[in-house]
Amino acid sequence: MSSDRRTARDCSAVFFGEFHDVHVGRAARSRRVHSQPHPHGAGLAAARRDVSRHHAALQSAKALRVLVDLFVERYVDAKLDYIAGLDARGFIIAPIVAYELSVGFVPIRKVGKLPYATQRESYALEYGTATVEIHEDACKPGDRVVIVDDLIATGGTMMAGKNLLERLGAVVVEGAAIVDLPDLGGSALLREAGLPLYTVTEFPGH
């Protein structure tokens, strides 16, 4: 697997730059706001970096192509069987990467969304808990899987996805995301649990 951080930084500049180029009038204010810790906790801090809010960047063929290529180049030689996407924003990028790699796509969904027999995993939120699930036949023992999401904040969703896949016998090769918010502790927690991580960019100070 490749780890060209210079290329990753270039992608970050292209992807998020597309958003600010379209919204020139907001750029200065955006930089000021994004430099301050969020006063209302991890949920809103993560929402501010929600990739789907940067719709202009997603609409840019150049930015989307660069972003997808980064993930594809990293995993092209990893001998994967599946890309697993986390509900919901992981579904933006994960199926595209799976298609480009000619591997299958496994959705890990919020509880109640999958039609057949499932395995469930709950995890803690700032105020309460959440549950995700996976089809019981989504993969088989020994299958090599990368989990993809848009953002790592507290790490709860990706940890739950890891636990579900491993319960089915899969080998979770790595967790991958576009954005890491390292000050929220999720990436450190995941690494301590033995999950290697790859992120395109990070935003400290949240």
Swiss-Prot record:
* Enzyme class, broadest EC rank: transferase
- Which UniProt keywords are listed? Cytoplasm, Glycosyltransferase, Purine salvage, Transferase
One Pfam match: Pribosyltran
Biological process annotations from GO: adenine salvage; AMP salvage; purine ribonucleoside salvage
Care to name a GO molecular-function term for this sequence?
A: adenine phosphoribosyltransferase activity
Entry's localization field: Cytoplasm
| Catalyzed reaction equations | AMP + diphosphate = 5-phospho-alpha-D-ribose 1-diphosphate + adenine
Its lineage opens with: Bacteria, Pseudomonadati, Pseudomonadota, Betaproteobacteria, Burkholderiales
What's the Enzyme Commission number for this chain? 2.4.2.7
Fetch the InterPro entries from UniProt. Answer: Ade_phspho_trans, Adenine_PRTase, PRibTrfase_dom, PRTase-like
Q: Which family does it belong to?
A: Belongs to the purine/pyrimidine phosphoribosyltransferase family.
Role description: Catalyzes a salvage reaction resulting in the formation of AMP, that is energically less costly than de novo synthesis.
Pathway entry? Purine metabolism; AMP biosynthesis via salvage pathway; AMP from adenine: step 1/1
Give the protein's recorded name: Adenine phosphoribosyltransferase
The source's domain of life comes to Bacteria
Query: What is one cellular component GO term in this UniProt entry?
Result: cytoplasm
Q: Describe its partners and assembly state.
A: Homodimer.
